[in-house]
UniProtKB/Swiss-Prot annotation:
The keyword Nucleotide-binding applies. One of its GO terms (molecular function) is ATP binding. This is Tunicamycin resistance protein. InterPro entries: P-loop_NTPase. It comes from Bacillus subtilis (strain 168). Keywords: Antibiotic resistance, ATP-binding, Cell membrane, Membrane, Nucleotide-binding. GO terms for biological process: response to antibiotic. Pfam families: AAA_33. It is a peripheral membrane protein. ATP binds at residues 7-14. Involved in the resistance to tunicamycin. Binds ATP. It comes from the Bacteria. Gene3D superfamilies: P-loop containing nucleotide triphosphate hydrolases.
Length: 197
């Protein structure tokens, strides 16, 4: 089973993925960006694409590895990744579903103001690459193809994770961490996922 968490940059995908991972056993957070970074490092600058999702190889690789993992891993794969192009969505998620694999897809929605505020907490201002993608992402992700939509403006990470688990009918382990431990865990996730563009 796959839980795909989509959303604009700053919507809380990665934090939600790791919150679910801590409370779903067994589970694994699968990061499609890693293949994108690998492609970016191996392609000559003169022919490199601005968005690694534009490489058919990126989409084919992630589809293939997710298909293989779904067939061999008995836990839940949690995939935090923004996909805005319907054709890319269909090449990966649509194809996995067509072949009978269970993919629960959720899009975390938030206002532009909320997204900018969240991006600032990770040192990305209004002129950052992520901030410049907000309008494109919010518009594209509002399409019905990207349902199930979850409005997150007034939800905590814990609320969003519990909402996703309920919609996917997955029981979560209780969160026995104190507030300090929860804060430290989320800070570590944030620090481990800072991307320098």
């Amino acid at each position: 089973m796959i839980i795909w968490i989509n959303g604009a940059f700053g919507s809380g995908k990665t934090q939600t993925a790791f919150e679910l991972h801590r409370r779903l056993n067994p589970s694994y957070v699968y990061d499609p960006e890693k293949m994108g970074f690998a492609l970016r490092s191996m392609v000559p600058q003169e022919i490199a694409k601005d968005d690694f999702q534009s490489y058919p190889l990126w989409r084919a690789f992630n589809y293939s590895l997710l298909a293989s993992l779904t067939d061999t891993y008995r836990g839940i794969l949690i995939v935090p990744m923004t996909i805005v192009h319907p054709e890319y969505f269909n090449e990966i998620i649509g194809r996995l579903r067509q072949e009978g694999r269970i993919v629960h897809h959720f899009t975390l929605m938030a206002s532009k103001e909320t997204l900018l505020k969240r991006l600032r907490t990770r040192a990305e201002g209004k002129n950052s690459w992520a901030a410049k993608q907000i309008d494109r992402c919010v518009e594209g992700l509002s399409s019905p193809i990207f349902e199930d939509h979850i409005q997150t403006d007034n939800l905590s990470i814990q609320d969003v994770a519990e909402n996703i688990a309920a919609r996917a009918e997955l029981p979560l382990d209780p969160d026995t961490r104190g507030s300090l431990r929860r804060f430290a865990d989320r800070l570590m996730v944030k620090l481990n996922h800072i991307r320098i563009k």
